[in-house]
Amino acid sequence: MENLAPAGNWDALRSAVAAGADAVYLGYAAYSARAGAGNFDEQQLRDAVRFAHLHHVRVHVTVNTLIKDGEMAGVVDVLRLLSEIRVDAVLVQDLGVLRMARRCFPDLPIHASTQMAIHNATGVRFCRNQGMTRAVLARECSAAEIALAAKEGIEIEVFGHGAQCVAVSGECLFSSVVGGRSGNRGRCAQPCRLLYTYRGKTAAWLSPRDVCMRDDLPELNKAGVASIKLEGRLKRPEYVATIANSYRNAIDAMNNGHFRKADEAEMTGLRQIFSRGGFMRGYAMGAEDAGVIDPARVSHGGVKIGRVEFAAGNMARVRLERNLDDGDGLQIRTAQGDAELIYAGHDTEAGQIAVVRLRPDIRTKAGDEVYRLTSEKQLQWARSLAIPTIPADMALIAYPGKPLALTMTDGESSVTVTGDTVAPAQSRAMSEEDARRSLGKLSDTPFSLRALTVQTAGAFVPVSALNQLRREACQQLAEARIAAFTRKAGREEPADDLIYPDTPDAPSMAIVRTREQADAMQGAADLLVWYPEDFRADALESGLRDMPDGVWLQLPTVCEEKTLDALDAFVQRNAGKLGGIVLGSVGQLGRTWNVPMGAGSGIPVMNRRAVQFLLEQGCRFVTASSELSGAELRTLMQNHPPVVVPTYGREQLMLLHHCPARTYLGLTKGHAACRMCDQHSPDALAGQTLTDRRGTVYPLLRQRLPEGCLVRLMNALPTNNIRRVRQAGYAPMMVLTTENAQEAADVRAVMDGEMRELEGTSNHWNRPVE
């Protein structure tokens, strides 16, 4: 199992290598899903790859944002650079980037980013069919789904430690719609960490705990996971060192048959360096609802070290439960809020009283809890981790009348360098100890001397000659190690022309959830699409009977493999009634659907190469990303591809795997078997909302699957670009979600020109996303 560590900058990269990472993932200066990380410019990236490869650490580079048409040429330049410097893999989300990478740089290893929302075996099969060598699975996958996915023949990578996105991977538009900063383009403003009101209680209902699966590595290994990914490209180097070192030791122990769960000291260290809401074991290990979300706290919680026993003026006496050291960062949780300070005083042991000096603005009292946010000793330990030296053997041959020769090997690569002809000694001949003194001076190199053999007799060798030989051997062995670990140079093929397959014109579409919405929209568009609330077998059969012949079925964005099997069977069984299907995720292209299909909004498309890719895969139409502006749509629509444009409807801001209703009740088990909504329980999600600090109300809609519910967080207002899309001549996509019969009829009237306008927002039409 690969220990894959984050490297947001050079210091973090060095920390990862020092801590025992097998591979690192990092971002180039552009097109990375963590634009806020330091990332690497071109020269830094070249140096980083050489440095990592010298230490036999792989480098994965993220090019995993959605790309606009005007950026595609720049992305190809980046791919060319990554191919040239021979990075070990490139992570992508955008289908246009995937297509260009596979066509122009066929030898460049491509990994499916978690943003691609690959969440079942069918999705991994799609990745394999497209020539990708690894899939980073969505964080919501269960261990059973991971095991099925691992049988598809490519590597599986899972997130094992750190912060979690609360929305289903790749399916979040909240930051984009509310603030214009797109998470799909690396600029998420994290509205999930804000407070919202649910049923009158204000809390962080969208803020997940950090995950820690350090103790679950054997189960993940058994499931077929090839790489455990540690989150943290925005974290400090000391965090990277601490986490990567912990997982390094655990993986080594597992491989040696001596695995043990982390003891209290190690787990405390993991919590101390950074933990939000304590830790959860992740969806893979069965975390659910209140076990996923920590409504009480959105930031680093640290480790509790004691309570205030007495406070007066600028001083507090704290009874310690853990040792306290000079320089520790503390947080006192007072009635007025959290107060943070740096402890300056004597190191004090648990059980004793520590005197803490307070700033004038801090008001605390007896009983207030004190937490340590940073441990100075832990940080010093993390900084002290040295990059391991590379053990090397040397063999020196120095005989008079023959060239001086030094062979140096690390056990895999070997180099021999020669010097001038050796002269006979006139007085004192070179000894083995003389040679060791000169050749062993390796402190300014990545090597350490493991063994030295010297063959000599009566030779005079100047110290300067030995030093020169040592320098040349070290330099050549470093180059040999890099070359041995670096994949072969790849070829570049020219990009093909942007030519779309022959397809019918884009259809206008109306997507409905209910029978009354379907009645209102009947005949209003070329295609009527049914997006069920309930995907269980009985509900699908009865719901389809209420729909007109020729209706298209919208597939869910996320579902387990067995659910997709059941949907496949349902589609085949009802092929005579269904007009076709709308795919909910790109991974659903991993199986053959014997009915017409189109690409829905769950497959984000921002550029023409992505359109080309999906049409080549057999889609009859493609849905444009709702993050495109009107001007960007004009570029996308050049040459009139069969692209439908989101025109009316509440934007799905998030697709949640946890249920706010169950989280509110503190439930941590029983998600799949929950029947609160079915039984119309007063505690059910139906009709509930989240309200932000400004009073904006966001509806919550459930989507029932056999494996349990997903929850759709909808925008407060519908997008309404009916007039703009009509004037542009695009094929509109109308999406009805919360509309009742009258509201649905009003939407129809506006479409038919019988009403002038409806309430709504233009979304990004006049406001391009960052």
Language model segments and positions:
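Surface-exposed amphipathic alpha-helical tracts and adjacent flexible/coil segments at the periphery
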Residues: M1-A18, A23-R34, R46-V49, H55-S83, ...
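Short glycine-enriched loops at secondary-structure junctions
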Residues: N9, T65, Q93-V97, M116-I118, ...
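A short acidic, glycine-rich active-site loop
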Residues: A37
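Glycine-rich, highly charged phosphate/nucleotide-binding loops
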Residues: F40-L45
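Short acidic/His/Gly/Ser-rich catalytic and metal-binding motifs that mark active-site loops
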Residues: M100
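Conserved nucleotide-cofactor-binding alpha/beta core module
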Residues: A121-T122
